């Protein structure tokens, strides 16, 4: 979150910008050029277009502070864009289409940043869907909301929510919508029902960075451990820290009754994970309870915006090709002795304290609103001073991570690639 000091600095910069505008109209034109270049960068999808737009931004920005401000302000969003019920498909590298329906408020205003909510359906053991949105069998009118963008992707028997192809597709769909719609990056939530609820657990355990909160309904995290269901994952409850959950299960659910989920809830409590657990009295495998529960659910979302760059971050990973990042930390190399690697990082001013277990190398991503780049940054790993130096901010680093995330609150001007001392 933006610190008070940075807010004051921003107000000062705004005042200076206004003064300069009166005296030197050329600066305003430069900002206009920056807005257009950022828009081109935001919308570029091919490697060639991305490379070209990145080079143009580097050439146009007089310094990294200006480039950061341009990216933080974001692209220009058009009012001439689809509203109401829309449908599209993300096409994977192997040609597989991943269709999704998205619902845009009829009075969508591009000047407003909208919360965005994904809704994952149940019943994933079905053939691949044809276009038309039939995967959401309850009708889309019930999902339409004037204050948010709703996204309903499709899952089927070759693409369960917890399969690798969906782990790639869901973030890609989110980025596709962010290219053209003004999304509040800190209010993107993931909700799911039945198998969709289990899918929500998957993203909470493995890919939480871009989500504010997770809402699994009548699902079960234990399914993710089952290798026959395409999962076979090891679940690390430390990965759920900093991302709250709203969990609902019925007492008489024929598939996932409260009694079967209760051991997982106990672990959440022991680990200190922020969560709400609602056990529906006499509830079955349905969402008949939803009208009564909705006010509390909506308040939960309001109360839990994402903190994109928390001071303390923990991540546990058993691989480094994927599922190895949380916010501004990444595990790059494990010891290879079958133990999962655990990385615990705390930031206090320019001092970073790291605890690393079963890890050989890791990366720290640095944001200029959290660190003073005019002073040395110190990193202490397992009690040993490992790094202390003035860190140089790089435009290309900023743009590379901006391209990956398309997130105006996850902007990094430097990265530290560090090894764990013996």
Residue ranges and their predicted role:
Residues 13-24:
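Bacterial N-terminal signal peptides
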Residues 29-114, 385, 393-411, 422:
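A domain-start/cap signature at the N-terminus of enzymes
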Residues 106-112, 159-195, 205-211:
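Gly/Ser-rich "nucleophile elbow"/oxyanion-hole loop immediately N-terminal to the catalytic nucleophile
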Residues 116, 120-179:
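Active-site machinery of serine-nucleophile hydrolases
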Residues 186-239:
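Primarily recognizes the serine-hydrolase "nucleophile elbow" in alpha/beta-hydrolase
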Residues 316-422:
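C-terminal beta-sandwich/jelly-roll accessory domains of carbohydrate-active enzymes
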């Amino acid at each position: 979150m933006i610190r008070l000091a940075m807010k004051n600095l921003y107000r000062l910069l705004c005042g200076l910008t206004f003064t300069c505008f009166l005296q030197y109209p050329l600066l305003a034109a430069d900002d206009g050029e920056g807005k257009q270049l950022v828009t081109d960068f935001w919308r570029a999808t091919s490697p060639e277009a991305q490379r070209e737009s990145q080079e143009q931004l580097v050439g146009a920005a007089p310094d990294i502070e200006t480039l950061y401000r341009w990216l933080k302000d974001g692209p220009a969003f058009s009012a001439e864009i689809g509203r109401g019920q829309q449908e599209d498909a993300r096409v994977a590298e192997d040609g597989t289409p991943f269709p999704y329906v998205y619902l845009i408020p009829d009075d969508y205003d591009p000047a407003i940043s909208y919360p965005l909510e994904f809704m994952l359906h149940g019943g994933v053991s079905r053939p691949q869907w044809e276009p038309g949105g039939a995967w959401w069998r309850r009708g889309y009118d019930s999902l339409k909301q004037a204050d948010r963008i709703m996204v309903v992707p499709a899952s089927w028997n070759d693409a369960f929510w917890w399969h690798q192809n969906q782990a790639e597709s869901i973030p890609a769909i989110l980025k596709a919508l962010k290219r053209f719609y003004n999304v509040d990056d800190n209010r993107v939530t993931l909700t799911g029902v039945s198998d969709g609820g289990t899918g929500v657990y998957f993203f909470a355990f493995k890919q939480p960075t871009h989500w504010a909160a997770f809402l699994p309904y009548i699902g079960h995290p234990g399914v993710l451990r089952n290798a026959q269901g395409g999962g076979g994952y090891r679940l690390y409850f430390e990965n759920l820290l900093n991302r709250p959950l709203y969990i609902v299960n019925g007492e008489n659910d024929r598939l996932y009754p409260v009694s079967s989920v209760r051991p997982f809830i106990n672990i959440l409590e022991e680990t200190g994970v922020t969560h709400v657990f609602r056990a529906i009295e006499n509830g079955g495998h349905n969402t008949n309870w939803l009208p009564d529960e909705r006010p509390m659910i909506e308040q939960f979302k309001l109360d839990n915006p994402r903190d994109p760059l928390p001071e303390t971050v923990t991540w546990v990973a058993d691989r480094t090709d994927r599922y190895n990042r949380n916010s501004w930390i990444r595990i790059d190399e494990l010891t290879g002795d079958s133990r999962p690697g655990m990385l615990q990082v705390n930031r206090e001013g320019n001092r970073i304290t790291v605890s690393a277990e079963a890890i050989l190398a890791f990366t720290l991503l640095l944001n200029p609103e959290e660190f003073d780049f005019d002073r040395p940054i110190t990193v202490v790993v397992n009690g040993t001073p490992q790094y202390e130096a003035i860190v140089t901010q790089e435009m290309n680093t900023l743009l590379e991570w901006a391209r990956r995330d398309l997130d105006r609150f996850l902007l990094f001007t430097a990265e530290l690639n560090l090894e764990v001392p013996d």
